[in-house]
Structure formats: C-alpha cells, structure tokens
From Swiss-Prot:
Name of protein: Phosphoglucosamine mutase
Function: Catalyzes the conversion of glucosamine-6-phosphate to glucosamine-1-phosphate.
Post-translational modification summary for this protein: Activated by phosphorylation.
Signal peptide: none
Cofactor annotation comment: Binds 1 Mg(2+) ion per subunit.
Phosphoserine modified-residue sites: S107
A Pfam family recorded for this sequence: PGM_PMM_III
Isomerase found in the keyword field: yes
The UniProt record lists the keyword Metal-binding: yes
GO terms (BP aspect): carbohydrate metabolic process; peptidoglycan biosynthetic process; UDP-N-acetylglucosamine biosynthetic process
C-alpha cells in the first residue's frame, strides 16, 4: 500500500492546507513519538529524545510548537535547535546519540510552504517501514501520557557552534581560505548565521548576502534556485568565488570570478577528479536520470563507472549504498560525499570544492576543461488525466526517431510528473537546435495523442 502522507522528502505542502496544519503536525509528533518509544533501540526505562530544527519561515514557530506538544504527549523529550540547516540536524542527531531528528522546512520552496522531514538516530532519512509505522499511528486516537510520563523540552546550547565545528572538520587541516574573497548567499534561510562563520573562521574574506530573514523572504530572489543575485554580487565585489545555498542549506550552486555558474553535475566531476588525486582511484559515482550526458562521458574517460538513479537525493543515496561508493549528485546541487556526511550538505560540499581547487591550484573552469555540457531542452506537456501515453504508437515512434537521429550523441528522457497530469519531455544533444527540434516533435506527438 502506498504511503498517504510521506513523499520522497518527508511531508510537505502549503501552510494552513492539509497536511501542514497545526492539528495534523501535533498528531504527527505524537505518532512519531509512539513509534520511537516502542523502538527496540530505546533502552528499557529510558525516554527517547528527538532534536527539532527549522528554517526561517514564519510558520516554523507554529509547527515547532505543535511538534513539541505531540512528542511530549507521547512521552518523548525534545531538544530545540532553532534555525538549523537540514544537514546540521542530521549531524547533531548522530553526534548527540539522539533517537531521531526532525527538520521543519520546505527547502527551496517559497515561504508559504513548509514541511516536516525526519532523520533516524544515525543521521539518515527514515526507512520506509518506519514511515509506514508513523502513518499507522496517525490513524489511532491521541492518548496523552500521564503527567509523570510527559516529555520535557529544552533548548540545545550552542547548536550552531557545534555544527560549525563539524563543517570545518571536513576541510583539510593543511589548507586554509586566507586570501580568498567569497560571496556566500544564504537565501535568507537556515544557514544565515552559520555559513558565513564557517568560511570566515577558515580564513576567507566573506561577503554575506541573503542573511536578513524576516519570515517571508526565504528563497525570494536569492539562494541556489535564484543564482542571479550571487552572480551580480560576485562581479560587483570582484570576488574569487560565490556560493549559493538554498533555504535549508542542503544544496548549492557555485559561481566563479567571471560570473560563470556551475551546477551539481559539473561539481560532481570536479570532486571525482580530486578524489582520484587523493585516493588514486574512484570506482564509481552516481547521478540521476537528469545528469548531463557530457559528465557521464567525461567520467567514463577517467575510468569511473557511472550509475543513474531516479530523480531525488534519496535515490542517489540508495544507489551509493548499493554500490559501496562515496560520491553522488543531482544537477540541482544536492551533493553526497558519504565519507564526510550521511546526507547532502551545501556547506560541506562547498568546502570539498574549495579543497579541490586548493589542492590542484586550478580554477573551476580549468578543472572542467574539455567537459562541455550538452544543451538540454525540457518541455512540460499537460495531458488529460489518466491518458495512456505509454501505449501510444505515435509517441513511441517520435521517441524512436529522435533516438535514432541522435545515435549516441544525445539522449531522450520522458518522465511523468508524480503530482499532476504532466509529461516531461527532455532531449539532450550536442547541438542546441537538435535538442529543441526533437523535443518539440515529441511534445507535439504527446499533445496529439493525449489531449
């Protein structure tokens, strides 16, 4: 049976609309607390403790209070971290030997959205069976613990400082950032206090932007999903590099001194090349169905195997574990380096990139010399609900014709949206005109067959 509430990245929606309402979130805290209290990992007679962190959305106060009440009613203690990047919650949960971590965030979405995601005691996203158990408890009545069994809540002292030190520990001790001018865009989000300190304490001259959250401006014209602000700031300040995080700081985009933007696909290649230097060999790396073909070809030239996961950092992580590899990424800027952290971390990923540049003595453009991303054309085609696009001979013929024409110099990817009756048509080719032409031909075939 499919999950009713949990998606690939927790539970998310518009604040005030189900399920992101205070009454549901209170019950969610209670349900999660009951699952934790019944876990075999909780010693007899002890009380589970969870950590709650959040980004800077105004709704975070309300949802934090609701979660806290739900956990307390289930007999679970709560530590409150305040504004904290998603990977910071994952780290602190693991480092403090807590039962679970909870993040209140909708990542790169606008302020009127919010969400809840959970981490297990080891700093990983919850397994499917645990999420299913929480959903089962959501169907049961809320029975508050007796007064002597209620959970307690307290603020976690120096949560930010602990995470700052962790981030710095991932940067080679032999290196520092002295002499580098960096623009750090925190998207008015969870890392607004933390990220500038990390880079400053490692010696960089830091120019922070997106560090004035007001509850409503998270991701608004700033951050990893709106990198134009970073490009302008890098050029205006004659900076060496710019780093943009998103609202919960689990992804990044990088801009060089010339104003060129580098996405997760390109940064993955840079990190693999650096790891070959430090480790002598990298067996393989993981991208997604959307990873640019040029990166796959370039990695294979280096003798590195490449596996494509479904879109979503959760699936990249699954493939990394299955193959026993360390490095994976999405073009959106989610980068995983499992020997550094259990989850994607924008700050740590930025430090890995900076370490690679320090080690090589080269710029990003130089490290990517010979890797030219293939142009991509993406068209979203709205269909009639329930339309059988897979069974259409005309759509199949259009796809086959495009693949035959590209013949190894490009690719076609067709994906149905998981939330609306939309078919995503993506064509990648060495020439932009070819990508556009083939994508439009397939899109026309989809429209004719499904609308």
């Amino acid at each position: 049976m499919g999950r009713r509430y949990f998606g690939t990245d927790g539970i998310r929606g518009t604040v005030g609309d189900a399920p992101i309402t205070p009454d549901f979130v209170l019950r969610l805290g209670y349900a999660a607390g009951k699952v934790l209290a019944g876990s075999a990992d909780v010693a007899a007679g002890s009380r589970p403790t969870v950590l709650i962190g959040k980004d800077t959305r105004v709704s975070g106060y309300m949802l934090e209070a609701a979660l806290e009440a739900g956990f307390s009613a289930a007999g679970v203690d709560v530590m409150l971290a305040g504004p904290m990047p998603t990977p910071g919650v994952a780290y602190l949960t693991r480092a403090l030997r807590l039962s679970a971590g909870v993040v209140i965030s909708a990542s790169h979405n606008p302020y009127h959205d919010n969400g809840i995601k959970f981490f297990s005691a080891d700093g990983n996203k919850l397994p499917d069976d645990t999420e299913a158990a929480i959903e089962a408890w959501l169907e049961k009545p809320l029975e508050c613990a007796a007064s002597d069994g209620l959970g307690k809540a307290r603020r976690l002292d120096d949560a930010a400082g602990r995470y700052i030190e962790f981030c710095k520990s991932t940067f080679p001790a032999a290196f520092n950032l002295r002499g580098l001018k960096l623009v750090i865009d925190c998207a008015h989000g969870a890392a607004y206090q933390i990220a500038p300190h990390v880079f400053h304490e490692l010696g960089a001259d830091v120019i922070p932007i997106g560090v004035a959250p007001n509850g409503f401006n998270i991701n608004d014209g700033v951050g990893a999903t709106a990198p134009d602000a970073l490009v302008r700031a890098v050029r205006a300040n004659h900076a060496d590099l710019g780093i943009a995080l998103d609202g919960d700081a689990d992804r990044l985009q990088v801009v060089d001194a010339a104003g060129r933007l580098y996405n997760g696909d390109e940064l993955l290649y840079v990190l693999v090349k650096d790891r070959i230097v430090t480790d002598g060999k990298v067996e393989g790396a993981v991208g997604t169905l959307m990873t640019n073909l040029a990166v796959e070809v370039a990695l294979q030239r280096e003798g590195v195997k490449f596996v494509r996961a479904a879109v979503g950092d959760r699936y990249v992580l699954e493939q990394l574990r299955e193959h026993g590899w360390q490095l994976g990424a999405e073009g959106s800027g989610h980068i995983l380096s499992l020997d550094r952290h259990s989850t994607g971390d924008g700050i740590v990923s930025a430090l890995l990139v900076l370490a690679a540049l320090k080690r090589s003595g080269r710029t990003l453009a130089q490290m990517l010399d010979g890797v030219t991303l293939f142009p991509q054309k993406l068209i979203n085609v709205r269909m009639k609900p329930g339309a059988d696009w897979k069974g259409s001979a005309s759509i199949r013929a259009a796809i086959d014709a495009a693949e035959a024409a590209l013949a190894g110099s490009g690719r076609v990817l067709i994906r149905a949206s998981g939330t609306e009756p939309v078919l995503r048509v993506m064509v990648e080719a060495q020439q932009a005109a070819d990508a556009v032409r083939h994508a439009e031909t397939i899109a026309d075939a989809v429209r004719a067959a499904t609308t």
